[in-house]
Amino acid sequence: MAATCPSVGKSNYQAVWAVLEDVNGVLQKPTAADYIVPRGNATMNQTPTNSASEELSESLNVTDQFQDAVDAGEASIPMYLRLDPSGGHMQAHALILAAMGKVQERDAVTASLTSEVGAEDDTIPVEDISGGVLPPSGVVEVDTEKVRYSGRTIEDGVVTALTNCERGYAGTTAATHEAAASLTLKSRVYMQDTCRNRVSIWMKDDHTVTFGSGGAVTMTEFSMSNSGGQNVDVTVQFQRMGYCGRSFVSGTPSGQNITVVDSKDRSAVKAYSVGGYIKNTTKNLDNSGAGYRITAVDPVAGTITVEGTITSFADGDQLDAWTPLSSPVGEPLESRRASIYIDGQVGRIREGSLSMGTPAEFLQEIGDEYPGEAVDTKRELSITMNSFFRGDDAAELGKGYDGYEIPVVVRFGKEAGKTLSIGMDRVKMSMPEIGVDGASYTLDRTGAILGAKGEDALYIVQE
C-alpha cells in the first residue's frame, strides 16, 4: 500500500531561517547557515485591515468596505539557545546581530598587562587596549593560559582591570605572567549600535513557506529558570510578506512560465509571491540545490515565471516550496546551567528574565501599499529576578525605594565553548515586591538596564 500524507499541514513539521539582508528591505535567500530550530510553533502574519464605508443609505447595513495600506507584519520565533562548540556563529546569529547592531569577532581585541599577575590572582590589570572593547565578561588568553572573567574595573571610561577571574580555563594551566605580556580576547561580542541590520524571515509550515523582508528585531527575551532548555524568544516586525505553496503543473510550460493548478485542477497562482522558490517534487528537481526562484506571478494567465532550466517539467508534476537542506547548530543548552553575578558576587535567584526591547517605527506614505523603512526608537531594556526572601534581604526594600545601581552578568551554560553571557554595567534596581510561593516568601526585583556613554548598556558575549 502506498504511503500518503494528509491534506492538512502537520503542526509539528516546521523550520525557520533568519537571514541578514545585503540591502535593507530586499528579500534575502536563505542558506543552511541561517537555519533555526523553533521551540514550539513560530508564527508569521501580515493581515490587511479594512475600513467600512461612511456612506449612508436607506439601510443600517454597511454598503462598502475599503482595504487599507498594510501595516508591518510580525513574526514570533521561540527557540532554545544553541551554541557552536567549535566557535562558529550561534543559532540565530542574524537575529541577535539585528537586535544589537554590530559584532566584534574573536581575536580582534588585544591589551597588555599593567603589572605581573600571579597564578592565583583573580584580578588582571590591563592597559593599551586596541582593536575594540573588553566587554563586562568574556574569555581572554595570556600566553597559553585562558582566563574567564565576570567583571571589570573602569576608570574615567577606560577598562583598567578584569575581575572575578577563573584561572586555567578550558583545560589550560594557570601561570604567572610578566608585566607587559600580551592579552587577547577570545570571545565574540555582540554590541549595541544606532544603526542595525534588517533580516529576511523564512518559515516552513509543512507544505507552505511564508517569508518576510525588511525585518526589524523588536524584542529579544532570555528566560532564567531551573527546568527545560534555555529559552530565547524573538519578535520581528517586517515590511512585506510573501508565500509559496503546493501546486501541480498544468500542460507544458512555455519558456519559463508555468501554469499552476491545485489538486482539483483550479488555478493555484494565488499560492505564490515573487521571491519564493519552488522545486519539482515529482522529478526530484531543485535547480542543482538552488531552487527555482519565482520572478513573476500573473493572476490573469494563472502562471508563475521562474529562473532556471525547467524543460523537464511536465503536466501533472507536483511543485513544492524549496528551502535549503539544513542542520541545527550545536546542542540546546539546559536552563539549569545558567548563573548570575550581581555586583561581582554569585547571585541566588529562583527565576527571572532579561528583556531587550528594540522597537522601531515603520514609515508609511501615501501611495505605498506596504510599510517603508523602519526607524529605531528608544530601547527598553530590563531584568527581573525572583528569589526567596531571606532575612538578610530586608535591606533590599529600603535600597530599592531609593534606587541603586549594580553591575550584573547573566551567564548561560558552564562548559568552555558552550557559554553565552550578557553583561550590564548599570542596572538600576527599583522597589521590590514581597510575594508567596508555597511555604516560602519571595522577593520580586526589577532593574532597568541603563547606558553610560554611547551604546554600552548591554553586551552579548559568546565565550
Regions found by a protein language model. Give the residues of each.
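Signature of extracytoplasmic/envelope-associated structural regions
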Residues: 2-119, 123-463
